[in-house]
Amino acid sequence: MITAPNYSILKQYIIEELAPFWQKKEGVLALPIPAVPWPKAEPLPPRVKIVALPSWASDIGVNGNILVPEQFSDNADASALWATTDWFSTLFWYLNGIPERIFELNHGPIHSYSYRLAGWDQRLWEHAWVNRIAKFLRRWASMEAQGTEAEVCGSLPKTSILLTHDLDATK
């Protein structure tokens, strides 16, 4: 079992990790995002659901939607799920691969191979969910502040691609 950090630490971690999306972080920090308690155990395979974004942010999602872990979104009216989802916990969950870590604690390493996670929802790996959520939070902050995203959060980072190579150590 992996225990989630204190919520204020979790939130600060997310703000720092995704700082390129909000050079000005105050607008995102002020969003009325609920802090949903973490479950005592992570369900495996993870249970996920689609959250429809509001019309003013539908271009950010995949067909206007974001895939989130069920435990961080209540069972409110489907059109209001975006406002009752714990986006900071969702980001932490994705960034840290929480379900994969739990699986590895119980079954050994998967070495980032999703095929070893039989029965898991493949949509988890089909889109850049963290980036989409960060862009959604930028848009939401600008709506709340009645300004542009650039005014409220700063400019988006220039796109860059980093090529890396995964090295495995052996004796």
What does each model-identified segment do?
Residues M1-K171:
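Terminal accessory/targeting
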